[in-house]
């Protein structure tokens, strides 16, 4: 019997798993695009798992940020959570790892687009946004931000392995991983590596209120349950637009008429609900310009809501400093 972590996302039904002795040879493997690779590839645990565990030994908590559908603001939420925790806890260290290989956006959102990664004796040095907040992204390795990355799964997995084994993060209290939408090779690779590390880990899922987004985030929750990924909770992003002049609230993406939305979905699927982040056009502008929305607009309803979400995230990890200061 195979574990979910060694079954490729595009595998047929009844796949024996890549580590099985029947990999590439079972009747279920007929017609699978991975058949030849599985039949001839090495069996047994990936030796990189032990190396990742060693390299991340000083990383206390690992947080995956997931979304079922693109365009729900997952990368924005990743940046907001990371900045908010770094601001609140200046005596702690935070890292962001952008594993959205084909669509790296963190360098722009965090205001370090065009920076270069430097090599040291202990590996790649991440780019620092603040004294206690650093970032690694494939965006730093491209000749131009307009360059397309056209890679198949194995090469993406190799890049993630390299990020986890060759980046000199140092001591971190939180490593936040920005992932691509859906449940793809990047998610399977990251999950396999993180499961073998010490410390705590879990996933925050980001959605918008409308049913078409909730449909996919339900699948993401199912993915987490199948792979035993602890679910920190669900954030409903762009829940409403709050006018900065009159504070009138308008639902841009209304939920189902039967009282749905992310909160009801969390009740149905028995996962924590972390809260709502209202839509603020100023946040979009800050992301485009790489500015810190939290310090630019500290009284924004989005920042107020974010602080409450950060408290819940830190409490999930058993952090006594999760309470608002």
UniProtKB/Swiss-Prot annotation:
Comment on bound cofactor: Binds 4 [4Fe-4S] clusters per heterotetramer. Contains two stable clusters in the N-termini of Nubp1 and two labile, bridging clusters between subunits of the Nubp1-Nubp2 heterotetramer.
MF (Gene Ontology): 4 iron, 4 sulfur cluster binding; ATP binding; ATP-dependent FeS chaperone activity; iron-sulfur cluster binding; metal ion binding
Annotated GO CC locations: cytosol
Binding site for [4Fe-4S] cluster 2: 243, 246
GO process annotations (BP): iron-sulfur cluster assembly
Signal peptide segment: none
UniProt region (Disordered), positions on chain: 1-26
Annotated Pfam families: ParA
InterPro entries named in the record: Mrp-like_CS (IPR000808), Mrp/NBP35_ATP-bd (IPR019591), NUBP1/Nbp35 (IPR028601), P-loop_NTPase (IPR027417), YlxH/NBP35 (IPR033756)
Disulfide linkage: none
Cell compartment(s), UniProt: Cytoplasm
Cofactor: [4Fe-4S] cluster
Residues that bind ATP: 68-75
Alphabetized UniProt keyword annotations: 4Fe-4S, ATP-binding, Cytoplasm, Iron, Iron-sulfur, Metal-binding, Nucleotide-binding
Domain of life of the native organism: Eukaryota
CDD domains: Mrp_NBP35
Sites where the protein binds [4Fe-4S] cluster 1: 15, 29, 32, 38
Family (UniProt): Belongs to the Mrp/NBP35 ATP-binding proteins family. NUBP1/NBP35 subfamily.
Function: Component of the cytosolic iron-sulfur (Fe/S) protein assembly (CIA) machinery. Required for maturation of extramitochondrial Fe-S proteins. The Nubp1-Nubp2 heterotetramer forms a Fe-S scaffold complex, mediating the de novo assembly of an Fe-S cluster and its transfer to target apoproteins.
HAMAP family linked to this entry: Mrp_NBP35, NUBP1
Subunit structure: Heterotetramer of 2 Nubp1 and 2 Nubp2 chains.
Protein name: Cytosolic Fe-S cluster assembly factor Nubp1 homolog
Top-level taxonomy: Eukaryota, Metazoa, Ecdysozoa, Arthropoda, Hexapoda
